[in-house]
Amino acid sequence: SDPELVKAKYRVDAIAFGLGSFRSKQTPKVETCLRKGVNFRIITMMPDSPYAAERDKEENKNNGTTSYSIQQLVEWADKLNSRSMRGKVIVKGYSCMTLDFYWRVDDVIYIGPYWYGVESQQTITYKYLAGGKGFTQYSEYFETLWNNTDLCRPLTQLTEATSRRRKR
């Protein structure tokens, strides 16, 4: 679980696979965030990407597991977006291998590697705070990916949400 999620005020960004464990455990907290107007932006692999099948091999999962989880993520986001909540969940797919887990809640970023033969929830995670070099580099990298229309394309029916900024 994410201890920072309930504290979210304006944004949650992620680079991940299907977030299956997160979706199964944290949907009520996500709904609370969405009612407050918090927007979620998630970058994942294209479900039909050969990299998704490769990740199945790396995590010793059945072929198609990662693709199915990504498809479920998109359906979950579309279902949440169909409700009248102030915040939205936008999912974009990209055609690259995802090398690191990225999780941002407002001014805190968590980064963790995807290791061969190890399930993604079982690796170390590093924490970066706004104002530091790590936070700046990772947040700028996320924005570069998110805005690259040659690399990323929307997977959810909703393709953009009104941006909320942190109050200073």
PLM-predicted stretches and their roles:
Residues F22, S69-Q72, G134:
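Soluble or luminal CAZymes and related metallo-dependent hydrolases
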Residues A52-D100:
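HKD-type phospholipase D/PLD-like phosphodiesterase module
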Residues Y10, I43-M45, P50-Y51, N62-G64, ...:
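Intrinsically disordered, low-complexity tails and linkers flanking structured cores
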Residues V89-K127:
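HKD (HxKxxxxD) catalytic microenvironment of the phospholipase D
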Residues S1-E54, E143-L151:
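PLD-like (HKD) phosphodiesterase/transphosphatidyltransferase domain
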Residues I111-R168:
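Signature of lipid phosphatidyltransferase scaffolds
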